[in-house]
Structure formats: C-alpha cells, structure tokens
C-alpha cells in the first residue's frame, strides 16, 4: 500500500510517500508451486549487447562487493607520490574486458511453499518463497548533448555525444514467514529480503 499522508506510525523522515509491504503468513493449504515466465523487449531481445566480463556473483545481484575500493584508499590521489598512485590504481577492479553477445528474452522464476501444522491447542503455519529475474535493456543512438547559449539561431555545443547504453538487471527476492497461533494468542516471525544488481555499459562517440 502507498500512503501519501503522514500519520503517527510512520518514520519521522517521511517525505512524499510511504510504501507499506504486507506479506502473507497464514498458509491456506499445504502446497508447492513453481512458476516460470519470459518476456520480449522490442529493440533489445535478440539484438547485440555489450557488457563487461563481470563476476559470477553478478548473476544473483551481489557483484558490487567484488568492485569495492581496496583498504587504505587515499582520500586524494593528487597528494601522494605518482608511483604510489600508479600502484594503487592497479589494485582496483581489473575486469574491464567487454563481452559482445545476443540478448536472450527476460527470464523469471519463482518457487513457493506453504505448510500447516497441528500442535494440540496451537497451529503453526509457514510460507516460504524465492523469486529470481534477469533481463537486458539496450538504448541505441541516444543523443547526449550539452549546450551553450544560442547564436544566430543555431545551437552551440559544449559536448555532442551519441550513446549506446546496455544494461543487465538482476533481482533476487525471498520470503520466510512463520505464524504460531491459538484461540487467544498469536506469534509472528516475518522475513522479507530483496536484492537488485545492475551492470551497465555506455559506448559513447562524439566530442
């Protein structure tokens, strides 16, 4: 649910809107389900894509940790000896190779499990779910210009670029909810996790 008005139960830094995510924690029946979906994007699917080599953990959205700055990173490279600056830059992520390949259709998977348990005067319910999706986007021949003021009715360019932008976005989500209840009491244990990773490459031509 999206709330646009402030109320007492919302955080103090409420600005503009507040999103409340309500997850189910009562299993209606014992069941297991698996779903698969795919989709096509005009101008992207089956077209040529270019991205960095990356790391295996990029496939589940956790590649950022492999690209973190080394320990003892200087606050300003300009104030250290040139050789020290050169040595430091060699420690930064070295995976700059570029792969060129054909974009496959977007892939989406989800798995869910619901189960109920009877415990004398209590009932125990579990809902678990995992979902995963990955997809590509390609934006070709995008104009990316910066202008000065007009002169004689013509645009004066500071920069005039043509960009090709390629992206791969991966989303991983998980849900693990437990509910223990009786006629008079209820105990809930809710877990909700989301991870999103984006790899992008911009190919730019111009001046």
Model-derived features: where do they sit?
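Surface-exposed loop/turn segments flanking beta-strands in extracellular/periplasmic regions
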Residues: 54-65, 145-158, 207
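Short secondary-structure boundary/capping segments
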Residues: 16-18, 49-53, 143-147, 204-206
């Amino acid at each position: 649910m999206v709330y646009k008005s402030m109320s007492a139960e919302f955080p103090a830094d409420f600005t503009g809107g507040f999103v409340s995510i309500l997850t189910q924690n009562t299993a209606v029946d014992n069941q297991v389900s698996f779903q698969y979906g795919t989709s096509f994007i005009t101008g992207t699917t089956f077209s040529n894509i270019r991205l960095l080599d990356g790391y295996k953990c990029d496939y589940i959205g956790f590649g950022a940790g492999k690209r973190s700055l080394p320990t003892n990173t200087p606050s300003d490279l300009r104030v250290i000896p040139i050789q020290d600056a050169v040595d430091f830059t060699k420690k930064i992520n070295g995976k700059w190779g570029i792969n060129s390949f054909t974009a496959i259709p977007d892939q989406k998977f989800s798995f869910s499990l619901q189960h109920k348990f009877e415990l004398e005067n209590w009932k125990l319910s579990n809902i678990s779910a995992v979902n995963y999706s990955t997809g590509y986007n390609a934006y070709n021949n995008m104009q990316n210009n910066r202008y000065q003021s007009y002169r004689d009715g013509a645009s004066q360019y500071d920069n005039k670029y043509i960009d090709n932008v390629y992206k791969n976005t991966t989303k991983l989500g998980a849900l693990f909810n437990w509910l223990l209840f009786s006629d008079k009491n209820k105990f809930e244990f809710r877990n909700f996790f989301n991870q999103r990773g984006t790899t992008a490459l911009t190919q730019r031509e111009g001046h």
